[in-house]
C-alpha cells in the first residue's frame, strides 16, 4: 500500500489538486491554514479558513472546562484561544477588505460555526471557562466588575487611571455631559464664547504692542498689523502671473 507522501507525489494527485485550486475549491482537511492571511485573495477560501478557526475555538473552549486540567494547562489553553481569536479577527478583516460580509460588525459577541455564543469572546485578552477561576484572575475579574470595567482594561491599567465608563456608570449625568445641552439655543454659551474670544484678542494685541519691532526681512501679514486690512488669498490668475514674473526674472538673470 502506498504511503500518503507517495500519493501526494503522484501525477493524478497533483492534477486534481491543481484542478481544485483553479476552481477555487480547497480541501481544508488536506491543506494547512496559511499564515500569511493577506496573501489569500479568495473570499470563499477566507470563509473556510475562518470556519476552521471557529471550530478550533469551540473545541478548545469546551476542553478548557474539563476539571482534570492543571493550572498550567488551563493557562496554555487560554493563550491558544486568545491567539485563535486574533487570527479569526484577521480573517474577518481580510474578508471585509475584499468586499465580503462584515463579520466585525457584531464583534462584541463571538459565535462558533453552529451559532452558539462563546462567552468571554470580546475584545482584548479574555479568560474562558476555568481560566476565570485561576488564582489572581478571579480576584481581578471581581475587582473589574465592581468598577464597571472589562478584564482587558483592568489588566492594561496600572491602577492609577479610570477605565472607560467606570466613573460615568456610577454617576448621574444628563445630556449636557455628552454635549447635547440647550445652552447654544438660548445664546448663553455663544455670548460667553464671544466675550472670551474678544478678551483673548485684546490680550494678544497688547502683547504684540509690547514686543520689539519685527526683524529685518520679515513683515506682518495683513490683518496682524492692526491696520484693518484683512487677509485675502490670491486668485489663480494672480498666482500664475507671479510665477511667470519669477520665471522671466530668472531667465533675464541667466542672460545677463
UniProtKB/Swiss-Prot annotation:
This protein's UniProt keywords: Cytoplasm, mRNA processing, mRNA splicing, Nucleus, Spliceosome
Stored Pfam families: Isy1
A GO BP annotation: generation of catalytic spliceosome for second transesterification step
Domain of life: Eukaryota
Renumbered residue ranges of the record's region Disordered: 145-167, 201-232
GO cellular component labels: catalytic step 2 spliceosome; cytoplasm; post-mRNA release spliceosomal complex; post-spliceosomal complex; Prp19 complex
Compositional bias per record (Acidic residues), positions renumbered to this chain: 209-218
InterPro entries assigned: Helix_hairpin_bin_sf, Isy1, Isy1_sf
Subcellular location: Cytoplasm; Nucleus
Family of this protein: Belongs to the ISY1 family.
Subunit-level organization: Associated with the spliceosome.
Free-text function comment from the UniProt entry: Involved in pre-mRNA splicing.
Protein known as: Pre-mRNA-splicing factor isy1
Organism per entry: Emericella nidulans (strain FGSC A4 / ATCC 38163 / CBS 112.46 / NRRL 194 / M139)
